Regions:
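Conserved anion/nucleotide-ligand pocket segment
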Residues: 128-193
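A conserved regulatory-domain signal marking ACT and ACT-like small-molecule sensing domains
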Residues: 298-300, 304-377
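ADP-ribose/adenylate-binding Rossmann-like module
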Residues: 65-66, 77-95
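ATP-dependent carboxylate/acyl-activation modules
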Residues: 257-322
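NAD(P)-binding Rossmann-fold cofactor-contacting core
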Residues: 22-40
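Glycine-rich adenosine-cofactor-binding loop
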Residues: 3-18
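Substrate-binding/catalytic subdomain of NAD(P)-dependent oxidoreductase enzymes
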Residues: 164-260, 265-267, 286
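Rossmann-fold NAD(P)-binding glycine/threonine-rich loop
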Residues: 71-74, 89-127
């Protein structure tokens, strides 16, 4: 029987405990929790060392979130020879280059299926696909909070502030929504997805992210006039050994699959050179969808399955591919030189490199950009 040390007893941790309690092949035996807690089948501790030094615990499930002390706990557990399951996309994306080689060196298993797509099982599917074919694209709608806000603005004719307020009232958005609306959550998920899909370790310093914070109702009205909707889209590509990766608001045609994704749902897509386009739809968060894939990872350990791919070489990101952009909120000489037409108060650019557009946005943080549609994958 697998003996589990559970770090954290919040939304995900409680779900993991409930799902494993009904099983005979695994058991949560110790739980790290800051608050006072009584559990029938597990010992509750405030000291991580109680889990670390328990030699009967073979697997640690990290569900405390954030970078610290999650990183220190996970690293110590790996060094102690314990398998790791985590749903913490920030942890995996930020410390991929340290934790993955360490796990392989120590001969322990490491999986994080729930870190991208919640209950969708996206990373496990990437693992299966790449056994047979080359994956040249991953991406799509990876953040339910942003999708809810954009969907509410489009369907209910709300302002950004009104849509955000509804998302917060429903529990889809935090009191401080920055990680979601600034694209950071999607950025983390794209990094993990791209590394698994392409079997490399992308240089994350070269991956830009633009969010939806500055979008307005007037922007949405303009998009509607042109038969378009706005979605926050992640893009990772591998073309002839050249890697690109970025997160940005993107305009999609009404008939595109992404346009039909409602509320807080995700739609994540891969494109392989044999099977073509495959898309995966579902809720990207929640207690049971997320806990479900944590337990699936534990079951994979029982069947001898470790990480989704071997740790790959460090590679640079090249975002020189060209896209046309809708830009509103700032104007300078570079933008005027690359203007193609105007949509109301906004400029639509000629095709410019993704990197140049994001560099421009860094200098004009109050502006809003959205890439125009590109050819269907």
């Amino acid at each position: 029987m697998m003996r589990i040390g559970l770090l954290g007893f919040g939304t995900v941790g409680k779900g993991v405990y409930e799902l494993t309690s009904a099983r005979t092949d695994m058991q949560v035996v110790r739980v790290l929790c800051r608050r006072e807690l009584q559990l029938q089948d597990a010992e509750v501790t405030h000291d991580f060392n109680d889990i670390l030094n328990d030699t009967t615990i073979d697997t640690v499930v990290e569900s405390i979130g954030g970078l610290h002390p999650a990183f220190e706990y996970v690293k110590a557990a790996i060094e102690a020879g314990k398998n790791i399951v985590t749903a913490n996309k920030a942890l995996v994306a930020t410390y991929y280059d340290e934790l993955l080689p360490l796990a392989q060196k120590m001969g322990v298993h490491f999986r994080c299926t729930a870190s991208v797509g919640g209950g969708i099982g996206w990373l496990s599917e990437l693992e299966r696909v790449r056994r047979i074919e080359h994956i040249d694209y991953v991406g799509g709608i990876m953040n339910g909070t942003c999708n809810y806000i954009l969907d509410a603005m489009a369907r209910m004719d709300l302002s950004y502030e009104e849509a955000l307020g509804r998302a917060q009232a429903l529990g889809y958005a935090e009191a401080d929504p920055s990680t979601d609306v600034d694209g950071i959550d999607t950025w983390h998920k794209l990094i993990v997805s791209s590394n698994v899909a392409f079997g490399v370790s992308l240089d994350i310093s070269g991956i830009p992210a633009a969010g939806i914070r500055n979008i307005t109702k007037k922007d949405m009205d303009t998009f509607k006039k042109h038969g378009l909707l706005c979605k926050l889209i992640s893009t990772g590509k591998c073309t002839d050994g050249v890697y690109s990766a970025y997160v940005q608001p993107t305009l999609v045609e009404l008939g595109a699959p992404e346009a039909a994704v409602p509320m807080n749902y995700n739609l994540i897509t891969l494109k392989g050179d044999v099977s073509g386009r495959q898309s995966f739809f579902g809720q990207g968060a929640g207690r049971y969808p997320t806990a479900y894939n944590v337990v699936q990872d534990c079951m994979d350990f029982l069947n001898g399955r470790g990480f989704y791919c071997s740790y790959g070489e460090k590679v640079a990101v090249n975002n020189e591919e060209k896209r046309a952009y809708y830009v509103r909120g700032a104007v300078d000489a570079w933008l005027q030189a690359n203007a193609d037409e105007t949509w109301g108060e906004a400029i639509v650019t000629k095709p410019v490199s993704v990197q140049d557009m994001h560099n421009w946005l860094k200098e004009h943080p109050n502006a809003f950009i959205a890439a125009l549609p590109e050819k269907t994958l």
